[in-house]
Amino acid sequence: MSGSSAAPGPGSGSSPAACRFAHYFVLCGIDADSGLEPDELAGENFDQSPLRRTFKSKVLAHYPQNIEWNPFDQDAVNMLCMPKGLSFRTQADNKEPQFHSFIITREDGSRTYGFVLTFYEEVTSKQICTAMQTLYQMHNAEQYSSVYASSSCSMDSLASSIDEGDATSLLKLQRYNSYDINRDTLYVSKSICLITPLPFMQACKKFLFQLHKAVTSQQPPPLPLESYIHNILYEVPLPPPGRSLKFYGVYEPVICQRPGPNELPLSDYPLREACELLGLENLVQVFTCVLLEMQTLLYSQDYQRLMTVAEGITTLLFPFQWQHVYVPILPASLLHFLDAPVPYLMGLQSKEGTDRSKLELPQEANLCFVDIDNHFIELPEEFPQFPNKVDFIQELSEVLLQFGIPPEGSLHSSESATKLKNMVLKDLANDKKNGNVPNNSVSVYELLKGSETIARLQALAKRTGVTMEKIDLPASLSEKEKDLKLQCEEADLRDSQLNVQLREVFANRFTQMFADYEAFVIQTAQDMESWLTNREQMQNFDKASFLSDQPEPYLPFLSRFIETQMFATFIDNKIMSQWEEKDPLLRVFDSRIEKIRLYNVRAPTLRTSIYQKCSSLKEAAQSIEQRLMKMDHTAIHPHLLDMKIGQGKYEQGFFPKLQSDVLATGPANNNRWVSRSATAQRRKERLRQSSEHIGLDSDLREKYMQEARSLGKNLRQPKLSDLSPAVIAQTNWKFVEGLLKECRMKTKRMLVEKMGHEAVELGHGEANITGLEENTLIASLCDLLERIWSHGLLVKQGKSALWSHLLQFQDREEKQEHLTDSPVALGPERRKSDSGVMLPTLRVSLIQDMRHIQNMTEIKTDVGRARAWIRLSLEKKLLSQHLKQLLSNQPLTKKLYKRYAFLRCEEEREQFLYHLLSLNAVDYFCFTSVFTTIMIPYRSVIIPIKKLSNAIITSNPWICVSGELGDTGVMQIPKNLLEMTFECQNLGKLTTVQIGHDNSGLLAKWLVDCVMVRNEITGHTYRFPCGRWLGKGVDDGSLERILIGELMTSASDEDLGKQCRTPPQQKSPTTTRRLSITSLTGKPAKPNAGQIQEGIGEAVNNIVKHFHKPEKERGSLTVLLCGENGLVAALEQVFHHGFKSARIFHKNVFIWDFVEKAVAYFETTDQILDNEGDVLIQKPSSKTFCHYVNAINTAPRNIGKDGKFQILVCLGTRDHLLPQWIPLLAECPAITRMYEENALLRDHMTVNSLIRILQTIQDFTIVLEGSLIKGVDV
């Protein structure tokens, strides 16, 4: 094989191996010299009969010996060719050959495919037959002793039927599933395998079956087997992109085709089978799990089913690529891989008759378990649905039905096969009745034999196990081999067409969802080196803006998907395409987006959730049909090789010993395909070398990319070949390092997103994390904690490893607590205020928090309880502390975990707890906001100012607590008590407290400093400042007040009634306006006109910003209206400016007094006699103003004058009437009597400016909290 750039070295294969269809041919089986070696790594069960045990297999031969850039991995190939080692059979057993494929993912992420045909050969070695006989004698002796060992035994399903005294039964037992060297013929498994660079599964399967047929056929093959193997290794090239290729097997030609550069990448695994095995509903659910990078475990007795589903799912991910551990067939010796605390997609072979419940998996909290054989899946909790899932499945169903495949799957079952046969026969009978089919059966066949219907029928019948003889068609049908061959080819064509059409539907969903993704890619780096260096610190995708641009139903899925590694890699590839050749998948995807824009013009911001079907199905199917109908390339025919005479002698049933010298290297003569491919290869090599000189060193690039991603590529794909303890230990150490790094990244992300620094630094202005994004990040943290607690677990006791650990800790602590009779609590016992009213300290207890969760009947699973406990601990800022306490019980940790487990690596564990501790810097409400229906106990304390007021009053006090989720209703406070506890449905974040009394008795005046309310589960304590009197004839005469809450810090040991470490977020209305208790507070400094105007502008601006945020980001509107710097307080400052002092009037005068005088003026003055120009403007607004003021005055509430003004402002804001009322009041004659001449309300320019500012909130729909306007009927 000339035309290569360098002469091939001995035993190395030829240079242009990258252009060859197949790289290696491999033979695996029993080594006669080694004899029978039990496969200990496969977890051998010696209770089984020897024929059911597995033994070590070996690679007997492989050709060529090695390829320089793709070294032969002997251990991995042997392990995957025979994942359970050698198996033995006798003449009585089924010995049908079995085909399966496998994949080897190298550390750099590149893949090699293997295609294996396993068949059985007669054992000719007497040594092995004797060894098997000996094993059976030993096994039968053990069985004999076990049968007679007990008088009341029922040993197992077989032995239980044996009569203890019946020797004949024992003989039957020994004969069942046994081996007798004199009576039985022993067979052993052997595998032939092709290793290829691309997954041409159908072509390799046909070639291997022809090779096997040549071995088992009575007639020897036309040429020695070496000719066919040499041909496929060295003389069959890879078809170029967009072309088809025909090469020759032993008996028939084999056809394959490769998609073009602008088509979806090659996928030869039939999605039809995946749909039949799982059903469309399950397939889409598993696909969603893989998209969200959940741990996914496939489970089946059949290796090829595992590969078909795994490859089918990963193929559908286009344009994204699976970035983590990918082992579709997990050999029995590698079951420890399931302990990996990283996302994975793995396949596990089930043993015959094994129940799912007996399968012990290290971690199931975030596992998607797919039982392929039983058509059953188990999904993780908190699982978001794929966008437009119902319409999506409907579109996929239509495609399947066009190909005669039921969307619900299970067509492989015998029952479905029978239904199919009956359905087809019924259709034929109906056609005959209708006169569409002649009576003559031969004519029926002649009519149908060339049709698509019969081709599909025969292809389906072949798959479902319905033989053609069972259908009453003429015998001549089975004799027409050419017709069957054509039908078989047509079935393959239809499989390929179905494949591409299903994939087009999936690809179309992503094209629609991410049609505008480029608009949100952040490209800040000037060159590749600086981008790679700072990759970890940079945000590459504007997630918040992207999500705000999406339809609401898409958000639960998209918010989680854009956090995955596969999406991050996709965006990385997009940014890298500035400096280097675009990733092939990205190139195809971008071209499709361009096509959408050409045919479907739309603005990037006009997102819609209307489902848009795929429009390119016919086009995609036609391109495949055109390639298969007309061959672009035909490979050289197999031919005689220069072999030694007498070797390679044919012996039926035995695969011959191949001549290695003729298979070690390629041919010396020129080959036009190889020459052409080699030239292209050399050109590609020159371009690669050139780009290396110009651009960044590739090693440096790979280093940075590995560092930038959450786990390195070597961690994402552990090696299958080296299973030494040192390598396993090193792999585990990498897992530990990876978990620690992931924890650091997640906590940092949570902090940055919560504080909003990231968005500000990127120039997006102020940005707070949305509830949806926060929920996504916290769910991701819960998943990480579950994976950490599952790593290195010794004994699994439930689906949640974390909750299991907590339960065992709780059990030990409660036993200890009973012994010592002391509660587990941390922190001081009590907190006292200066007034002597005590707010009892909430116990800081891990066990108590667990009990809260255990009392929540809404949560049904251990995984749900663990997540709720994490959320509660995070909200209480105790997550790190609780976990530290949990892990402080070292004997328990040692009992539960292996030495290599993350939780037993002390240094890493301490760093992990430190990273979690950093989350205490921000406030989370992730428990309160999620569990909205649970009953929560609250404790309230009223703190009076004793120096100036009675602590106890004779009247009947009451309280009403309101939050974002509801209110308690009016609750009577027991007399002479300032503290009370109550239980009600979760109120959410607390916003207001209404407090009052009925003014009865002699001591009915009450000066309240503040009210404290605490959530007894989360520990959140709210302070509601008051500082005002409640009573008639004092202050503004109010018997009830509305107080606005501020959240206190949980760590402060100061007086809760006086101090607050954090700046107050909210204050009760009017507390900063003016206080009549001058002896206590002194006279506050009055703001000047400029400060007042600035305050108005700020208050209105805050309301405008509130409504410009996404709905889930908005805070409390009550605070913006009635809080310390709210609109009410700002307008009070305006109305107080220049207000004539009480010294002149000899009594306290309030703004409401001025309002009432204005109303009296409007009601008594006959405005019709006034200037008619003013009447038109004033009359409607003045009537409305009077109506609102009178409604407030007549409301059945004992609200003071300041409280009434607050209600008036709130209603005027809600109904957009303030800009009309302000000029009315400014022009009212009473203003000259009650205001100084320099007052702001008497300055026309200031009033006009105020009106313009208030008009900016006219377009917003303002909804007031019920507690603010309760009882006012307008």
Curated annotation (Swiss-Prot):
Described function: Guanine nucleotide exchange factor (GEF) which may activate RAB39A and/or RAB39B. Promotes the exchange of GDP to GTP, converting inactive GDP-bound Rab proteins into their active GTP-bound form.
Domain annotation uDENN: ranges: 39-244
Organism: Mus musculus
Domain cDENN residues, every copy: 263-399
The name this protein goes by in its record: DENN domain-containing protein 5B
SMART domains per the UniProt record, alphabetical: dDENN (SM00801), DENN (SM00799), RUN (SM00593), uDENN (SM00800)
Classification via Pfam families: dDENN, DENN, PLAT, RUN, uDENN
Modified positions (N-acetylserine) in chain numbering: S2
UniProt family annotation: Belongs to the RAB6IP1 family.
Superkingdom assignment: Eukaryota
One GO CC term on file: membrane
Residue ranges annotated for the RUN domain, each copy included: 772-932, 1118-1267
Location of this chain's protein in the cell: Membrane
Domain PLAT span(s) in chain numbering: 936-1044
PROSITE patterns: DENN, PLAT, RUN
Main location: membrane
Signal peptide region: none
Gene for this chain: Dennd5b
Phosphoserine carried by residues: S49, S178, S822, S1068, S1076, S1079
Gene Ontology biological process terms in this record: positive regulation of triglyceride transport
GO molecular function ontology, one term from the record: guanyl-nucleotide exchange factor activity
Transmembrane segment boundaries: 916-936
